Amino acid sequence: MSLLPYALARSFLFGMDAEAAHELTMDMLARGQRTPLQWAWCNETVSDPIELAGLRFPNRVGLAAGLDKNARCIDALAAMGFGFVEVGTVTPRAQPGNPKPRMFRLPEARALINRLGFNNEGLDAFVANVQRSQVRTQGRGQSKLLLGLNIGKNATTPIEDATRDYLTCLEGVYPHADYVTVNISSPNTQNLRALQSDAALDGLLGAIAEHREQLAAAQGRRVPIFVKIAPDLDEAQVAVIATTLQRHGMDGVVATNTTIRRDAVQGLRHAGETGGLSGAPVLEASNAVIRQLRAALGPTFPIIGVGGILSAEDAVSKIRAGADVVQIYTGLIYEGPALVGRAAKAIRDLR
């Protein structure tokens, strides 16, 4: 059980610039993991296993990509009670991301806006960090944490050459991932969301599917591939994406990323900042996409629901909308690690 009341830490962190607070937190987690300091945020892992895409998830609550872009804190995050952790987004080459300031809190709406732009240390450093994780080397028996590795393209790579970056990343992370997520939905890399369009998505997923089969044959292991999509899609676009996912044998979908809409935060400080909005205002838009995906994909296609979970009830709403498992990120910032267990127990109690 966590020894540190998160309200105390949050009061201190919220007095800082949002990105500076994030970096301080990640440094603390990286230094404290695998030491007695880890008890400050340690929580029991709720047992609520589910089989999806050939994987056994220990429970239905995971960490969304974006918090730990460089895979520095896997062991620390595992101690919070997550059933699965997704790290990244990683790109082939290191890149600084967009100019600062680029992360903003909207506390009145329990939300964040970021335009980080896939800032990361690159594929080689990312893989080295994954390999250092003790959770990955030791495992946890039947309750082994699952690890998702989230891949993207470099900002300097022309959109017409994006497939090359995704294939490079897929090959690099493949031996180390329980599943891979293809991120085509961040609003903070120019033209990236164009990859969600019919022809572009068809070409990209076709190439990824082909390369995955080559890697599976060479390594004797078929790693599931998920695709992360945006909430800013109409029903026709969701239907096209669903068809394309199935046509190319993708194993699941992550719904959704951040939104570029600002309807729910108009008039608030920082509401006009460019970037992706996450947190409570995204819940209903994300759930709507999940419902549309479930209707289009049928009852068995795996859906990871993410977007706007700040309470156990929010997590349950994702499951009721059609998600099989859920992920949190902004909720962790506002509510702290205890949210993981509360959400996992509420979902378990649905049974």
UniProtKB/Swiss-Prot annotation:
Binds 1 FMN per subunit. Its cofactor is FMN. It comes from the Bacteria. The keyword Flavoprotein applies. It is a peripheral membrane protein. Substrate binds at K69, N114, R115, L116, G117, F118, N183, N188, N257, T258. Pathway: Pyrimidine metabolism; UMP biosynthesis via de novo pathway; orotate from (S)-dihydroorotate (quinone route): step 1/1. GO terms for molecular function: dihydroorotate dehydrogenase (quinone) activity. FMN binds at A65, G66, L67, D68, K69, T89, N150, N183, K228, T256, G279, G308, Y329, T330. GO terms for cellular component: cytoplasm; plasma membrane. Pfam families: DHO_dh. Its main location: membrane. CDD domains: DHOD_2_like. Keywords: Cell membrane, Flavoprotein, FMN, Membrane, Oxidoreductase, Pyrimidine biosynthesis. It catalyses: (S)-dihydroorotate + a quinone = orotate + a quinol. It is an enzyme of class 1 (oxidoreductase). Its EC number is 1.3.5.2. One of its GO terms (biological process) is 'de novo' UMP biosynthetic process. It is found in: Cell membrane. The keyword Transit peptide does not apply. The active site is at S186. Belongs to the dihydroorotate dehydrogenase family. Type 2 subfamily. Catalyzes the conversion of dihydroorotate to orotate with quinone as electron acceptor. NCBIfam families: PRK05286.1-1, PRK05286.1-2, PRK05286.1-4, PRK05286.2-5, pyrD_sub2. Monomer. This is Dihydroorotate dehydrogenase (quinone). The gene is pyrD.
